[in-house]
Amino acid sequence: MWLHTGPFCIHPRPLLVSDSAVSSFIPAPLRCGRFELTFERPLVMGILNATPDSFSDGGRFLARDDALRQAERMIADGVDLIDIGGESTRPGAPPVPLDEELARVIPLVEALRPLNVPLSIDTYKPAVMRAALAAGADLINDIWGFRQPGAIDAVRDGNSGLCAMHMLGEPQTMQVGEPRYGDVVTDVRDFLAARAQALRDAGVAAERICVDPGFGFGKAVVDDNYALLAALPDTAPARPDGRAYPILAGMSRKSMLGAVIGGKPPMERVAASVAAALCAVERGAAIVRVHDVAATVDALKVWNAVRAAARQ
């Protein structure tokens, strides 16, 4: 859930994941620009790719009017946040020139801001971060974990939410060969802890930070990704107050799903994507990043109804 920030803000009861072994994993609230995200239920982040070459929907929403219609459709379907991307980060994707990325995403931020839904920008470029925040973005979602020179300086001030993701390597080469880890869960958690600490050392409040284990980004397609999903609560480092940083999980239509459902192409991975989202929220994910908003929202309504009945 999101609430407008102001002089006062009431925090509803936080999410209790389940009565299972992960029931003590309670996401802390996340400050997110104009909003405060209070996770008494998991939130759905809808993907809006203003790109010609994204692995699943490349080219469908490159035109501004098409992108705006898709955003309005997601809002009607019950989306909680919209994540706007102007550069594909699929394995092997080439970088996009700065001016081109700005031209793709900034007009969308400006056009969507009046719709009163939290807006996230999927970028690793400091100049895009600055421009997006100036245009009214509420969250910066960085696959590089704010490791690019100038990235932390670009986001240090203000109240925007910041999502630091784990990636081994870089998009062009991250899936070349088999990624190697000592222990993937420990390695990912240690990396995310270091990135959160780097942000905090620069003066960023812990309440602005969330983390993403980076499914599909420099991970063995089956072994690493499913190990991370199975142990999802263990990937989140602790904040100074002892609560876990909120987890954003993005598995929608990815190859880790295709690999276990007979190699179906991305557009035929909807059911698998919804199943993965449910597995993630059962294991404590605060936000799931998805292409298929309506299906995910409906599935989570059923999941929440079961949880409510179990509490009675």
Language model: regions and residue ranges:
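Short acidic capping loops at alpha-helix termini that bridge into adjacent secondary structure
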Residues: 205-208
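Catalytic domains of carbohydrate-active enzymes, especially glycoside hydrolases
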Residues: 73-85
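Active-site-adjacent loop and "lid" segments of alpha/beta metabolic enzymes
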Residues: 24-27, 39, 56-70, 89-110, ...
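N-terminal amphipathic alpha-helix/helix-capping segment at the start of soluble metabolic enzymes
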Residues: 16-49
